[in-house]
Design a protein with these regions (language model features):
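Compositionally biased, charged N-terminal/linker segments
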Residues: 1-87, 148-156, 161-177
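Aromatic- and Lys/Arg-enriched surface recognition patch
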Residues: 76-168
């Protein structure tokens, strides 16, 4: 079995934020923080993932910039107090708290499968590979990238960063402490 980091974002474009709002105010971070409400949780994975692999969920550092830009657009349009504005403000606070952190981990429960319809109108991600994830554990103390960037380089071009045995062992030690 192996491990990989899946790096997820806040909504990137206004259409994505509006879509998330219309569908119950659910961002990627909300889905993860409240994963029991979304069982079975399906998430983007490495297409070579196998059942039993460990998935580490990391909130992208750039999420703060994206959600701030969208919230600024809403404020400039005079919609700060609208339902969408309140949703954006709440998302901004959440993403500020978790950006750059591994917030949870889980296990690949079923073989990866491709899909062309991820269920959202305007997804920012391009990977068609998903898998059902179970045994999710939210970290009481999220692990900031500054704690592991000296031994793991998180991919900036894709959502998935595969970990070698040594990297995973060091990261497990951080999680355990």
């Amino acid at each position: 079995m192996s491990a990989f980091i899946t790096n997820f974002q806040s909504p990137v474009e206004m259409q994505d934020l509006e879509d998330r709002f219309r569908r119950g105010g659910i961002s990627n971070l909300n889905m993860l923080l409240h994963w029991r409400q979304f069982q079975p949780l399906e998430w983007t994975v490495d297409k070579q993932a196998v059942v039993g692999d460990t998935v580490l969920f990391m909130c992208a550092k750039t999420s703060v910039d994206h959600i701030e830009r969208l919230y600024t657009q809403i404020r400039k349009a005079g919609q700060k107090d609208s339902a969408l504005g309140r949703f954006a403000a709440a998302q901004q606070a959440l993403y500020k708290k978790y950006a750059g952190c591994i917030v949870a981990f889980g296990r690949v429960a079923k073989e990866p499968f491709p899909t062309e319809a991820p269920g959202w109108d305007a997804p920012y991600w391009r990977s068609p590979w998903y898998a059902e994830i179970d045994h999710i554990l939210l970290l009481d103390m999220p692990i900031h990238i500054s704690q592991f960037r000296d031994f793991i380089t998180v991919s900036r071009t894709g959502a998935i960063t595969r970990l070698n045995t040594e990297q995973w062992a060091k990261l497990r030690t951080l999680i355990a402490t």
